[in-house]
């Protein structure tokens, strides 16, 4: 009984409930809730990241300078038919630095991770601004790392 009393009167933080039984009263199977489900932070290989493109999986992850951001709530920009859809499931660093949305600036999952060491100061500044935008708007959920034997 004390659990219910604490729940109703503030003793339990519902955001920390591992059972998923508390919350805003919405069902956990509600499709509108899928984009807000928490994602466990971790390491992503480019191959793994490529699955989170809004097509193969509802979630949309984008990497910038080795950090992976959950951009699912920006689906209108990064999802299918969005203006930045080419970045979904990829390392978008070079494309953002060059202000280019062409596929030829995005590496495939089986290519080495782009070191970005040939960018000009202006391109680095542009990438800095984009990264700040992502850091302020989307949760960082992990790190992009090379897959042994693949991205080397």
Curated annotation (Swiss-Prot):
One Gene Ontology biological process: regulation of ergosterol biosynthetic process
Molecular function, one GO term: heme binding
Short name of one Pfam family: Cyt-b5
Compositional bias segments (type: Polar residues): 24-35
UniProt superkingdom: Eukaryota
Gene Ontology cellular component list: endomembrane system; endosome; membrane
InterPro entries assigned to the protein according to its UniProt record, in alphabetical order: Cyt_B5-like_heme/steroid-bd (IPR001199), Cyt_B5-like_heme/steroid_sf (IPR036400), MAPR/NEUFC/NENF-like (IPR050577)
Domain Cytochrome b5 heme-binding: 46-145
Additional observations: Present with 6300 molecules/cell in log phase SD medium.
Record note on domains: The cytochrome b5 heme-binding domain lacks the conserved iron-binding His residues at positions 81 and 105.
Name the record gives this protein: Damage response protein 1
Organism: Saccharomyces cerevisiae (strain ATCC 204508 / S288c)
Gene name of this polypeptide: DAP1
């Amino acid at each position: 009984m004390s659990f219910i009393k604490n729940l109703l009167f503030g003793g339990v933080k519902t955001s920390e409930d591992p059972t998923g039984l508390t919350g805003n009263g919405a069902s956990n199977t509600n499709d509108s809730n899928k984009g807000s489900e928490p994602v466990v932070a971790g390491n992503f290989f480019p191959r793994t990241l490529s699955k989170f493109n809004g097509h193969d999986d509802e979630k949309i992850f984008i990497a910038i300078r080795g950090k992976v951001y959950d951009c699912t709530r920006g689906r209108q920009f990064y999802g299918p038919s969005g203006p930045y859809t080419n970045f979904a499931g990829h390392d978008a660093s070079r494309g953002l630095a060059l202000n280019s949305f062409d596929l030829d600036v995005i590496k495939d999952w089986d290519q080495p991770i782009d070191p970005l060491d040939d960018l000009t100061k202006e391109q680095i500044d542009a990438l800095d601004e984009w990264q700040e935008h992502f850091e302020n708007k989307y949760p960082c959920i992990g790190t992009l790392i090379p897959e042994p034997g693949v991205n080397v």
